[in-house]
Swiss-Prot record:
SUPFAM superfamilies, per database record: Translation proteins SH3-like domain
Family: Belongs to the universal ribosomal protein uL24 family.
Record keywords, A-Z: Ribonucleoprotein, Ribosomal protein, RNA-binding, rRNA-binding
Gene: rplX
NCBIfam families assigned to the protein according to its UniProt record, in alphabetical order: rplX_bact (TIGR01079)
Protein name: Large ribosomal subunit protein uL24
Signal sequence segment: none
Cross-referenced InterPro entries: KOW (IPR005824), Rib_uL2_dom2 (IPR014722), Ribosomal_uL24 (IPR003256), Ribosomal_uL24_KOW (IPR041988), Translation_prot_SH3-like_sf (IPR008991)
Taxonomic source organism: Ruthia magnifica subsp. Calyptogena magnifica
Lineage per the UniProt record: Bacteria, Pseudomonadati, Pseudomonadota, Gammaproteobacteria, Candidatus Pseudothioglobaceae
Length: 103
């Protein structure tokens, strides 16, 4: 079970966007895409046949998983994730600081 999943609220712990929070929109092997953060400018060539207008656009660039931490909204801080098996035998993720289950 992965510790960071799609739609998790994460906080960036290093780099130019440090202390910024956002939702995970894509999880790769060792990288994540965070909505609205770690933006890079991409030069796009116009293509009238495809209906693409040219110019400079901003896209989200993947961040290393080691540079983000899951955001605990109860404590308003970055937190660590643990994995345990509940009474029904189903694995669940929880915050290590206050033992709350991550929904």
């Amino acid at each position: 079970m992965k510790k960071i999943k799609l739609n998790d609220e994460v906080i960036i712990i290093t780099g130019k966007n440090k202390d910024s929070t956002g939702a995970v929109i894509k999880v790769l092997d060792s990288k994540v895409l965070v909505e609205g953060l770690n933006l890079a400018k991409k030069h796009v060539r116009s293509n009238p046949n495809a209906g693409v207008t040219g110019g400079i656009t901003e896209i989200e660039v993947p961040l290393a998983v080691s540079n983000v931490a899951i955001y605990n909204s109860a404590t308003k801080k970055a937190d660590r994730v643990g994995i345990r098996t509940n009474k029904d035998g189903i694995k669940e993720r929880f915050f290590k600081s206050n033992n709350e289950v991550i929904v």
